[in-house]
Amino acid sequence: MANCVVLDWQGQEAGKATLDLKVAKETTAVDLIHRAVVRQQAHSRQGTASTLTRSEVRGGGRKPYKQKGTGRARQGSIRTPLRPGGGIIFGPKPRSFSLGMNRKERRLALRTALMARINDLMIVQDFGTALKVPKTREIVEALSRFGIADDAKVLIILAQPSEIIIRSVRNIERVKVIGADQLNVFDLLNANSLVIGEKALSTIKEVYGDD
């Protein structure tokens, strides 16, 4: 079980929160998280690259030159892979890069990744609810009040990010905001600091706390 400090919008301590999630054994945690990240990255690949083989390239019905008498190596098609404009040998074709992983393993990897970042995590009460219109400066100043370095990558996890928050954050290259239902291993590990809304924390504990 880990104890976390709950901050208000001004960066002052507003209470305490606990996070107790089942994690993988130390001997298997690295391998489990690695497989989860590889799977997530593989699923983001489109797999639409496609080349033409010698049977698909336009042309190729005629013989480039006669079989004998030229002194050159014999060739039977102008679309052989040995000629410019010919087909591609073993080129890429549309395919799926998806990798399988058991649901229990995926959930365990996510819980393990989250608990591994517990020292870089802060809980914020009513994150951004005071904003009435999108203001990037307000988000930057708030992160500074929370003690986050200016050059740090920040992942903000909210129960349901409002349009105001999304528009306030989207112009900050180092900051990313996601919903609690979009929690994933790569983003958890890629960020230097995690900012979790109090309601999002409740959602995470409700969804992942029963395993």
UniProtKB/Swiss-Prot annotation:
Disulfide bonds: none annotated. InterPro entries: Ribosomal_uL4, Ribosomal_uL4-like, Ribosomal_uL4_dom_sf. GO terms for molecular function: rRNA binding; structural constituent of ribosome. GO terms for cellular component: ribonucleoprotein complex; ribosome. GO terms for biological process: translation. Residues 40-80 are annotated as: Disordered. SUPFAM superfamilies: Ribosomal protein L4. Transmembrane segments: none annotated. Residues 41-54 have a biased composition (Polar residues). Residues 60-71 have a biased composition (Basic residues). Keywords: Ribonucleoprotein, Ribosomal protein, RNA-binding, rRNA-binding. Part of the 50S ribosomal subunit. One of the primary rRNA binding proteins, this protein initially binds near the 5'-end of the 23S rRNA. It is important during the early stages of 50S assembly. It makes multiple contacts with different domains of the 23S rRNA in the assembled 50S subunit and ribosome. Belongs to the universal ribosomal protein uL4 family. NCBIfam families: rplD_bact. This is Large ribosomal subunit protein uL4. It comes from Prochlorococcus marinus (strain MIT 9211).
